[in-house]
Regions:
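Extended carbohydrate-recognition surfaces in non-catalytic/accessory domains of CAZymes
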Residues: 21-124, 178, 184-187, 199, ...
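Accessory beta-strand-rich segments of carbohydrate-active enzymes
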Residues: 25-27, 38-39, 95-207, 229-230, ...
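Extended substrate-binding grooves/exosites of carbohydrate-active enzymes
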Residues: 37, 61-67, 154, 190, ...
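Short flexible loop/turn segments that cap and initiate beta-strands
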Residues: 46-48, 233-237, 278-284, 644, ...
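Short glycine/proline/serine/threonine-rich loop/turn segments at secondary-structure transition edges
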Residues: 116-119, 160-165, 179, 269-282, ...
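Extended acidic/polar, glycine-enriched regions
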Residues: 160, 223-311, 675, 681-682, ...
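Beta-strand-rich structural segments
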Residues: 222-226, 288, 625, 639-642, ...
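Short S/T/G/P-enriched beta-strand
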Residues: 310, 612, 618-638, 647, ...
Length: 819
C-alpha cells in the first residue's frame, strides 16, 4: 500500500475530526474487549467478573468462527418473492453459521478531559448486530434494535466524575429467523468515543449542498447545527480546501442562533474539480466555531462538487453527461472475514469491481458501513443506499417488521444524515421487494418513507426495488416514486415505461445468474433452476433462477432503449447464505452462487463477460472452459470467448475451429463468441482476436494440465501498513511442471505465517466446503484458493508458507511498513 493510502486510511477512521486545539477528541474502542455468548444477569455492572471471557478486538463477528452446521437457523418458509407458495425446509439460508443467540461485550474507557471542566461525551456505534442495549457504569445508556444502522448516545451524565475507568457493556441478541442471508453477529463495526465542549457541532452536524454547479463555478451551502447554542452569538470561520490542501473559499459569519436553527454559510468555488467516477475530486470544509471570541469547536466535513439530474425520457445525468449505471448489488459480509468491517478488504473488493468497469454499488439491503461510503467517495463509485428488506409486513418471522412502525423514521433519519454529504451517494432506495408493495394502501407507506428522504435531503431522488410488476403498475405504488426501480422482470420493462409517468426504468436488481468458479456442466444449454448432485452450478453462465435471467438480456435492454437507466447486478460478490438454487434442504451449501466474483475474491468467468462490455479503457480476452477433460475425448465441449474485440478465431492443436463474430442471431451472440461443436482432445486451445480492421490484436492460450506438481503464491499486496489491521490477499494455485493450473485439484493446503504479521483467514469459493475460514488450512477448489495475512503493529516482513502433501511448497513475503 502506498503512503497516500495510509493517510487516507487514517482519515477514514474519523471523517469529521478536530484539527488541533484539543477541543474535540474522537477515538475508537478497538482493543481489550471481553466477549462471551450467552446471557448474564449482572453483566452490565462494573463489578461483574469477565476475566474468563474471550479477549477480542472490535470490529468482531462472533459467528464467523463457526462451525458450519445444517441445524443453525434452520427455517421452514415459503419465499414468496421467489414465487414459492409452499413452505419448505431452507438449509444454509443464513450461511449455516451460529449467529443466533445472545452475546455480551465489555470494555473500559477513559475521558480525562472531564477533570478540566464540563464536556459532552458521546458513544457512536457504526453497527451492532443486533437489538443493542448499551450500558455505562451499570446504567442503560441507549437501545437500538436495527443491527445495520449507526446510532449514538450521550453518556456524559453516566461517566465517573474524574472521567476514568468507565465500564462499557453491550448486550446483543439475534433471534432465529431474523434474516434471509448471513447477517453476522456482534460489534462487527467500529465503536467511537467523541469528546467535545458543551457547545459543539453534534454527530452529523453539517449538511453540505451544491445548489449550482458548472465547469467555471460552483455554489456551496453549508448548514452547521450546534448543540447548547440557543441565544448565543456565534461566529464561524470556515475554509474550504481542495484535495491538495489549498484554500479555495473562505467565509467568516456571525449570527445569533435560536430554536435549534442551523448556522448557514454560502460559498463560491471557481473552476471547481467536479466529482465523478472518472475524477473523484474531494473537498474539505474546516469550520472553527467561536462564542465571545473563544474557540469552542472545530469540525471537518468532506464533500464533493457534482450535479445529478434524472430527466424523463432521457435518463441519468452526472455533471451534464448522460450515463447508464454499470452497477452491482453487494451484501455486507466480507466472505471469510464475516461481517467484521475491514478497510483493506473493502478496498480490495472495490478495486476488483472497478477493473471490471463497475461504476456503482447498491447496498443491498441495508445501511452500509461508513468506511464503504468513504471509499466510494475516494475511488469514484456511485452509490444507491438502501435501508430495508422489509417494512411492516414480514418476510422473516423475527425480521425488521417488528420495529418498523416505531423505528423506521429514526432509522431513515440516521441513515440520511450520516451519508447526505457523500458525493458518491446519488440516490436513496427505501426498500427491496417488500410485501407491502401489493397492498392497496402500500403506496402510503412508500410515500411516508419517500417524504422522509425529501425532507431530510431534497437533493437526491428516491427509488425502491419492486418485483411485483402487475401490483405496482395498478395500485399507484410505482407511479409515486421518483425513480421506478424493478428487480428482474426484464420482459415487463417496456410495459412499465409506457404506463408510468416518470418515463424511466432502472434495473435496481438484475440477472441473478448462478455459477461456481471453474465448474462446467454438459450439455451446455440455457436452464432455469438447474441443480446437480454436487450442489454446484455451471460456469458457462447459462443458468439462472426461475425468477431471473442471464446477463445478456440486461445488456441488450440498456443498449436498445434510451429510457433504461442501467442496472445493478445481483451480485458483485458471492456472499454467505441464500445458496440458490440449493436453498431447499440441500446441505452442504452455505453461500450464494450469484456473484460475479466468488467468496474467495477470485473472479469467475462471468467477470470477463461484464468486463468486455463495461471496461472501455482496456482490452478483454477471456476463454472458457479449462482444457483438462480426460473423460471427454471426442465429445462436444463448447468454447466461449468473452471479449471486446468484434471477432476471433479458435484453434485446437493448431487446427482452426472457425471464426466467430458478434451478431444479432441471438442475445447471447451479441455479447459472446461461441464455438458449440468443438470436439475435445487434449493439447493447446488458442484464440486469436481481431480488431475492427481485421488485424490480429491479441491472443490467449489454454493448455491441458499434467499432474499436479507444485503450489504457487501471488499477491497484489506487496506492501501493507503496520497497523495491526491491514490485510494482504494471496492467491494460491496448483500447477503442473509447465506452470499450467490444475483445474480439478482439491488438495488440502496448510499455512504457516512468521514475522511481522499473522494468519487471518482463507477461502476457496466452494459453496459446499465446510472448512472453517479462520483455521490455517483450506482445501483448494478448482485448483485455487485465497489466503489472507494481517499485519501486526511492528514494521517488518510477513512470511507466508503454503504446504500440501505430494506438492512442492511455496513461500511469499509481504512487507509491513510503518505509518
Amino acid at each position: 500500500m502506498k503512503k497516500i493510502d495510509i493517510i487516507l486510511f487514517c482519515l477514514l477512521l474519523a471523517p469529521c475530526i478536530l484539527m488541533g486545539q484539543g477541543l474535540r477528541r474522537e477515538f475508537l474502542l478497538e482493543k481489550n474487549w471481553r466477549f462471551s455468548k450467552g446471557d448474564f444477569e449482572q453483566a452490565a455492572n462494573a463489578a461483574f467478573d469477565d476475566s474468563k471471557w474471550q479477549q477480542v478486538a472490535v470490529p468482531h463477528d462472533w459467528a464467523i468462527y463457526g462451525p458450519f452446521d445444517r441445524s443453525h437457523d434452520l427455517q421452514q418458509v415459503a419465499v414468496t418473492q421467489n414465487g414459492e407458495k409452499v413452505a419448505t425446509v431452507k438449509t444454509g439460508r443464513t450461511g449455516g453459521l451460529p449467529y443466533v443467540g445472545i452475546g455480551w461485550y465489555r470494555s473500559t474507557f477513559d475521558v480525562p478531559e472531564l477533570k478540566d471542566g464540563k464536556k459532552q461525551v458521546v458513544l457512536k456505534f457504526d453497527g451492532a448486530m443486533s437489538e443493542a442495549r448499551v450500558y455505562v457504569n451499570g446504567q442503560e445508556a441507549c437501545f437500538w434494535p436495527f443491527g445495520y444502522n449507526t446510532f449514538h448516545c450521550d453518556v456524559t451524565n453516566l461517566l465517573h466524575t474524574d472521567g476514568m475507568d468507565n465500564q462499557l457493556a453491550v448486550r446483543l441478541e439475534n433471534k432465529p429467523q431474523s434474516s434471509r442471508w448471513y447477517p453476522g453477529a456482534g460489534l462487527y463495526r467500529n465503536v467511537h468515543v467523541i469528546v467535545t465542549e458543551e457547545m459543539h457541532v453534534p454527530v452529523w452536524g453539517t449538511y453540505v449542498t451544491t445548489p449550482f454547479v458548472s465547469d467555471s463555478s460552483a455554489s456551496v451551502r453549508i448548514e452547521t447545527n450546534l448543540e447548547n447554542a440557543d441565544g448565543k452569538a456565534i461566529r464561524i470561520l470556515t475554509d474550504i480546501l481542495d484535495s491538495d490542501g489549498k484554500v479555495v473559499a473562505h467565509k467568516e459569519n456571525q449570527q445569533k442562533l435560536n430554536y435549534g436553527n442551523p448556522f448557514v454559510q454560502n460559498f463560491e468555488i471557481r473552476n471547481p474539480s467536479l466529482w465523478s467516477p472518472e475524477s473523484p475530486s474531494l473537498y474539505r470544509a474546516v469550520s472553527k466555531i467561536y462564542v465571545d471570541d473563544k474557540l469552542v469547536d472545530q469540525y471537518q466535513t468532506r464533500f464533493g462538487v457534482r450535479d445529478i439530474k434524472f430527466i424523463a425520457d432521457k435518463g441519468f445525468f452526472l455533471n451534464g453527461k448522460l450515463r447508464k449505471f454499470q452497477g452491482v448489488c453487494n451484501h455486507h459480509d466480507l466472505g471469510p472475514l464475516g461481517a467484521a468491517i475491514n478497510i483493506s478488504a473493502l478496498r480490495y473488493q472495490l478495486e476488483l469491481l472497478m477493473d471490471m468497469g463497475c461504476d456503482a454499488i447498491r447496498t443491498a439491503h441495508n445501511m452500509p458501513a461508513p468506511e464503504l461510503v468513504e471509499l466510494c467517495d475516494e475511488l469514484g463509485l456511485m452509490m444507491m443506499i438502501e435501508p430495508f428488506d422489509e417494512w411492516n409486513i414480514a418476510k422473516c418471522k423475527n425480521g425488521y417488521h417488528r420495529f418498523f412502525d416505531e423505528w423506521a423514521e429514526r432509522d431513515m433519519v440516521n441513515m440520511i444524515h450520516h451519508f447526505r454529504n457523500n458525493p458518491s451517494v446519488v440516490m436513496w432506495s427505501i426498500g427491496n421487494e417488500v410485501p407491502t408493495q401489493c397492498r392497496p394502501d402500500g403506496y402510503k407507506v412508500a410515500s411516508f418513507l419517500q417524504e422522509i428522504c425529501h425532507r431530510e435531503d431534497p437533493t437526491r431522488p428516491v427509488t425502491c426495488g419492486m418485483d411485483q410488476v402487475s401490483c405496482v403498475l395498478e395500485n399507484g405504488f410505482a407511479s409515486m416514486l421518483d425513480i421506478p426501480g424493478f428487480n428482474y422482470r426484464v420482459h415487463r420493462y417496456e410495459e412499465a415505461y409506457n404506463k408510468l409517468p416518470q418515463n424511466l426504468v432502472l434495473g435496481t436488481e438484475t440477472s441473478s445468474t448462478v455459477s461456481s468458479r471453474g465448474v462446467y456442466k454438459f450439455p451446455v444449454e440455457k436452464r432455469g433452476d438447474a441443480t446437480y448432485s454436487d450442489h454446484q452450478s455451471s460456469s458457462y453462465d447459462m443458468e439462472h433462477c426461475s425468477w431471473s435471467n442471464l446477463p445478456d438480456d440486461d445488456f441488450a435492454l440498456a443498449e436498445d432503449h434510451h429510457w433504461t437507466m442501467g442496472q445493478f447486478v445481483w451480485t458483485g460478490f458471492d456472499y454467505l447464505g441464500e445458496p440458490s438454487p440449493y436453498d431447499t434442504d440441500a446441505w452442504p451449501n452455505h453461500s450464494s452462487m450469484f456473484g460475479i466474483i466468488d467468496l474467495a475474491s477470485i473472479p469467475k468467468d462471468r467477470y470477463y463477460l461484464y468486463r468486455s462490455l463495461w471496461n472501455k479503457k482496456e482490452s478483454t480476452l477471456h476463454m472458457l472452459p479449462h482444457w483438462t477433460w480426460p473423460d471427454r475425448v471426442g465429445e462436444k465441449t463448447p468454447v466461449f470467448v468473452y471479449t471486446n474485440y468484434p471477432r476471433a478465431e479458435l484453434f485446437l492443436n493448431g487446427k482452426s475451429q472457425g471464426i466467430q463474430e458478434k451478431s444479432n442471431q441471438s442475445v447471447q451472440h451479441r455479447y459472446r463468441l461461441m464455438w458449440m461443436d468443438v470436439l475435445y482432445e487434449p493439447g493447446e486451445l488458442k484464440v486469436i482476436a481481431y480488431d475492427t480492421a481485421g488485424n490480429i490484436a491479441e491472443e490467449k492460450i489454454i493448455r491441458t494440465a499434467g499432474k499436479p506438481y507444485k503450489l504457487e503464491l501471488e499477491t497484489n499486496h506487496g506492501t501493507i501498513p503496520a497497523d495491526g489491521k491491514s490485510l494482504a490477499y494471496v492467491r494460491v494455485k496448483v500447477v503442473d511442471k509447465e506452470g499450467n493450473i490444475c483445474p480439478d485439484e482439491g488438495s488440502l493446503v496448510h499455512f504457516d505465517v512468521k514475522g511481522a504479521g499473522s494468519y487471518r483467514a482463507a477461502a476457496n469459493g466452494d459453496p459446499t466446503c465446510l472448512d472453517m475460514f479462520h483455521l490455517p488450512q483450506m482445501h483448494l477448489f478448482s485448483g485455487q484458493l485465497t489466503a489472507i495475512v494481517q499485519s501486526s503493529e511492528q514494521p517488518g516482513y510477513i512470511l507466508l508458507e503454503a504446504k500440501s502433501k505430494g506438492l512442492k511448497s511455496a513461500k511469499i513475503t509481504v512487507k509491513s511498513e510503518g505509518l
